[in-house]
């Protein structure tokens, strides 16, 4: 059975527009079957990231809010003024959490986008337009640590911005700020720091980067897409988490995904600005169109009111107390799982992570551990250079017994890896780096395989 098309033999494949419609009941029955089977992949708590809440009651509550506004286009605020309430209050709650009140010389603002990559794209667009209008920069560049998300590479590719990749300290996995300072120039429009980075769960030296940004006069974007809605609660709980938000002078934008640790539905994120004027630099206007005067705050035109309503409902139903409670359980579980990793001399954590961690081995290929644990139901995210396994701890992992099961299975996996260390790992070809480093030929082959995979995912069998 194809992993891409597992339902081919059980459900009809729609190969063209049906001549007659099916009954709604039959359609919903099919959907319920698929959903029930797919939920099993994460309900056990063995799946890294992906499902951040895992509470079906919370999902049902947000679905109730969603369906009330699912048909509404928030572009038309005269018909749905509620969208301004939802959007404005989502932004206000996010700015409150990120200490927008620490800003006194400008007016903080925000933009609700469709996800983390979209927030990053809008941030890079805002910096490009601001630099063009106010600094006369026509050939802009951005500097990011090599660990910063691939969305920055995508955004710079789409926007025609040169991207420079700074190395990290291999011991701490944090950005090399001295390298950034040396390679920034008069055309640098922004630098990037992660809080935390996706790969290792470590936080870049944001305060040091903020001082550099102020000294050199460019922006500092903090990518909190993953950590933005949990690290603030970790700070409040007393964990040793460095400053990364608007309390740091020099931080000009922060991305934080409401569809991750704010526990909203997929399809929303917030881009927070220290200065509303920077947000205005990425607005779009067309005043002489035959269809009338047109404007949009971001790249999207039409958007469903359902996602705004559901996100707003989810955030206001949890409140500070709810978020703190969930964060406490997640941090405690993450550190228990990290302790299980550190119990094995052959394994080591990458840097000093918090709720999200990655581990590797200098004794054997870590993908031997993955080979053993995947049949047990564990789904890690694979890393490369060096090969490593990543676990973003979410609410499903906080269920009773999950951390203990992780420790027990990991111990057996390490024994397995010791016994098979002279053999190639089975999953290394899927996740791991190319031995000896990437070559042009290997890069071209991998791109071809990925393109075929994406074509398959958008086709029918």
Predicted regions span which residues?
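Conserved active-site and cofactor/substrate-binding residues in soluble primary-metabolism enzymes
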Residues: 22, 26, 57, 61, ...
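Active-site C-terminal subdomain of aminotransferase-like
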Residues: 236-354, 359-364, 437-441, 445-448, ...
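Glycine- and acidic
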Residues: 12-13, 70-78, 104-111, 139, ...
